[in-house]
Amino acid sequence: MNVIEGVVATPNARVAIAIARFNNFINDSLLEGAIDALKRIGQVTDDNITVVWVPGAYELPLVANVLAKTNRYDAVIALGTVIRGGTAHFEYVAGEASSGLSSVAMNSDIPVAFGVLTTESIEQAIERAGTKAGNKGAEAALTALEMINVIKAIKG
């Protein structure tokens, strides 16, 4: 039986981070967590990390797609925060961001890590950006690194 598992130490990985500016008071913490995980745990160098700011979570799939198509990156990490309000806007933005990023991953053959918080409140978002519930930006970075190695192992 063959078992393929990825490791997170990936010193030569080239990683792009697409991050939404909207809700940046939360997203800045997600970015800090992602960069810390890439550098400290993944051993990725500054030169191999590219950060691209976009207006909001809805724009993340387009930019992730463009980044993936450049063939300059081994993975893309998407970071953002969508907080439920009093209208259906939350469902549209969260759903399209999720489905769009999934589509990019499926069509590009590189990992697209989903670090977009979809929360009921600002408090929940803050908890997931580095307080009570860990840092989902760091988790997305570790997912991206592990998936880079899983895909490399599968392809041989």
UniProtKB/Swiss-Prot annotation:
Residues binding 5-amino-6-(D-ribitylamino)uracil: F22, A57, Y58, E59, T81, V82, I83, F114
Q: Could you tell me which pathway this protein works in?
A: Cofactor biosynthesis; riboflavin biosynthesis; riboflavin from 2-hydroxy-3-oxobutyl phosphate and 5-amino-6-(D-ribitylamino)uracil: step 1/2
- The active site is formed by H89 (proton donor)
Q: Which Pfam families match?
A: DMRL_synthase
Catalytic activities: (2S)-2-hydroxy-3-oxobutyl phosphate + 5-amino-6-(D-ribitylamino)uracil = 6,7-dimethyl-8-(1-D-ribityl)lumazine + phosphate + 2 H2O + H(+)
Residues annotated as binding (2S)-2-hydroxy-3-oxobutyl phosphate are G86, T87, R128
The answer to whether keyword Transit peptide applies is no
Which cellular component, as a GO term, is one annotated location? cytosol
Indicate the segments annotated as coiled coil, or none if absent.
none
Protein family membership: Belongs to the DMRL synthase family.
Give the protein's recorded name: 6,7-dimethyl-8-ribityllumazine synthase
The role this protein plays is: Catalyzes the formation of 6,7-dimethyl-8-ribityllumazine by condensation of 5-amino-6-(D-ribitylamino)uracil with 3,4-dihydroxy-2-butanone 4-phosphate. This is the penultimate step in the biosynthesis of riboflavin.
